[in-house]
Each structure stands twice: as structure tokens, then as C-alpha cells.
Amino acid sequence: SAGSAAKPVLEVSISGRSTSTEIDTATWQVERIVGTRGNPQPFYGLIGDIPELSVLEQNFHGLHLTQATSLFETITWAVLGQQISANVAASLRRKITENYGRVGETDGQAYALFPRPEDLVHANIEDLRSLGLSQRKAEYTLGLRDEFGSGQITESRFEAMDDAEVETELLKLRGIGPWTAHWL
């Protein structure tokens, strides 16, 4: 990035030939990943009057929360990480990525990509259980695959909703309770 914390500028470079749609998609994803699509001002307003927290704004002004590359990854990661340690959750995520994800390459460097719903089309409960998922987490993961794969859940649909509507929709999904819906 360029600019300053007060006036940040995000620079994105894409190698190779790309269509304008691909460039727009890549830019949107980078903005999502590095968190620049959100406005931190409401957060600053909440913590500004609390001395113990206002130091966060002073020390980390301009910092944005990073996000996963897709809503599917975000929600799946939230479900996988429930009621287990961060290390175990990261291990499950890694195993799912290694077994079902794709490999992207940039400048000769390979990157493991979290699977898309269609990458999990042949996965079944036993397959996911063999990776260490519990019965329920395997069921929930496949349920999310089906919801996203069928188009019932889309990022554009969620982006058009306010927070309360998103939370209501999330609570309809198996594996997501009030705490997870609010966290997401």
C-alpha cells in the first residue's frame, strides 16, 4: 500500500494478461483480504472514550482486519474453529486445503488455495472425518458446500443486507448459532 494511515492508497499489480473483469475481481478480492472495504471509523467511535481501548486507535490507527478470500471460506472457517483450539482449527483448515483446494501460482511460487464449494462436490462425511473433522463439523461443512453451490448463499446477496439481516440469514444455516453469526 501507499499513502498514509490517514489517507491510505492500495496498489494492486497483476502479472500476465487479464480482462477488465478479472482485474476488477482481483482488486475486489485484495480489498477484501486486506480489509480496506470496511470503514474503521465506527470502531474508533466506540473505543475513543474508553482509555484502556483508545490506545489501540493511537497505536494501530488505519489498521484494518484481514479477511478470508471468500464468504464460503470465512463461514466454513468459523464453523471449523468452534469449540476447539486455534491450532487444531488451523490443522483442519490446512488438511481440507491440501486435500480439496487448488494450487495457484504467481511468479513461480505455488500457493495452496482454500477449496471452493465445487471443489468439495465429491467429498462425503467419511472423507472429512478421515481428515479429523467431527461428525457434526463434516455435516456442517457439506451443508455449507451445498448452500453455496446451489446459489442460496452469495456474497452479493449478503453485501446488500444490513447486519441484522445477515445475522438472521446466518442463523438459518446448520452449524451457526447466535455467537458465530454475531462474530461473522
Report the location of each language-model feature:
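HhH-family (HhH-GPD) DNA N-glycosylase catalytic core used in base-excision repair
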Residues: S1-L184
